[in-house]
């Protein structure tokens, strides 16, 4: 595949639920009515390169991960299978996976949603001090995603800043499940596993090829957040102790994702997420009910619609009772509530 021009996805579409895909028995469908137009490079990882594209049909941006080495095809299909069964607001959403022929070459391409504010590595490169409140908000969302994965007996095995993506509205997306492992039973959950991941963020038990479980992801999470805490004077002792607990040498001493969510520092924030179920009579909930079924794949478009709907409600219900500034403040408050609704509901 070239790195410019239009990408036609009409040759093969792989069924992510079928692990027997090959040239002869792939599940296929004709999707020639949609093409992806190349915008720019988006990075390169172990599996292959990634590009940013736009759909000529919907004008929505996506990321396409292109895997060209045949020995990595199986891993790519496994990643697609996992993304297909992982429907969670804090996990990157898959659109499709397909094979593309280019002369004598074949690539497996995974199309996923585009996070419009880069990844946490980009935030590190900006070399700005991230405040504790923001780090806690990120940590909470990542733990929502990890808790979901671990309950499905899925280990990510490569948590690091480059694999945690961010949207401009603050929503976190865990991505790159290429090294992930679906554990089929409790015995396998406790077995010795393969040496995988990025060494800097790798747990001691994985480095030493010992038995490991979900706590290996917790260790990697702790190392990720330590990268943001070079100036420890900016953070509370409670926060520093929480992050320190994630990188304990013994896995049994590390908290689970659910235990992190129940930490006093995060519990109040978590409650704010969960309290959306009690917002049945709020203006924000009425807006949410009105727009939740709209097929908006771009979250910026979603929030623009929310803002427009909020203005309509304000005009209908309050008319001249509030100033424009007061209205704007309420819009921002409702956007926060709706942000939580997207994650929880």
What is each PLM-predicted segment?
Residues 150-166:
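Catalytic-loop of the protein kinase fold
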Residues 138-139:
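Activation segment signature within eukaryotic-like protein kinase domains
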Residues 93-106:
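Short beta-strand micro-motifs within the conserved protein kinase catalytic domain, predominantly
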Residues 105-119:
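Conserved short submotifs of the Hanks-type protein kinase catalytic core
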């Amino acid at each position: 595949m070239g790195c410019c021009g239009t990408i036609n996805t009409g040759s093969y579409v792989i069924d992510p639920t079928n692990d027997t895909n090959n040239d002869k028995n792939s599940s296929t469908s004709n999707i020639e009515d949609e093409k992806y137009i190349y915008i720019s490079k988006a990075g390169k990882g172990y599996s292959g390169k990634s590009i940013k594209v736009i759909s000529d049909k919907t004008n929505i941006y996506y990321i396409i991960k292109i895997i060209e080495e045949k020995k990595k095809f199986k891993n790519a299909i496994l990643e697609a299978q996992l993304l297909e069964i992982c429907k969670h607001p804090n996990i990157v959403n898959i659109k499709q996976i397909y094979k593309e022929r280019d002369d004598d070459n074949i690539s497996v391409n995974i199309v996923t949603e585009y996070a419009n504010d880069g990844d946490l590595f980009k935030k590190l490169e900006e070399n700005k001090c991230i405040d504790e409140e923001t780090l806690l908000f990120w940590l909470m969302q990542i733990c929502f995603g990890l808790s979901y994965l671990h309950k499905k007996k899925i280990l990510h095995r490569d948590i690091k800043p480059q694999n945690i993506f961010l949207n401009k509205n603050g929503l976190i997306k865990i991505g790159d499940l290429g090294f992930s492992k679906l554990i089929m039973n409790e015995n396998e959950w406790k077995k010795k596993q393969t040496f995988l991941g990025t060494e800097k963020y790798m747990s001691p038990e994985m480095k030493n090829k010992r038995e490991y479980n979900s706590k290996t992801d917790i260790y990697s999470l702790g190392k990720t957040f330590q990268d943001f805490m070079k100036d420890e004077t900016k953070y509370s002792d409670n926060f520093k102790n929480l992050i320190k607990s994630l990188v304990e040498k013994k896995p049994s001493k590390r908290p689970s994702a659910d235990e992190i969510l129940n930490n006093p520092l995060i519990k109040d924030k978590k409650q704010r997420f969960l309290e959306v179920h009690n917002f049945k009579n709020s203006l924000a909930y009425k807006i949410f009910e009105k727009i939740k079924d709209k097929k908006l794949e771009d979250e910026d478009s979603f929030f623009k619609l929310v803002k427009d709907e909020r203005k309509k409600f304000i005009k209908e219900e309050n008319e001249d009772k509030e100033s424009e500034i007061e209205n704007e403040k309420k819009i921002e408050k409702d956007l926060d509530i709706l942000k939580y609704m997207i994650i929880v509901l």
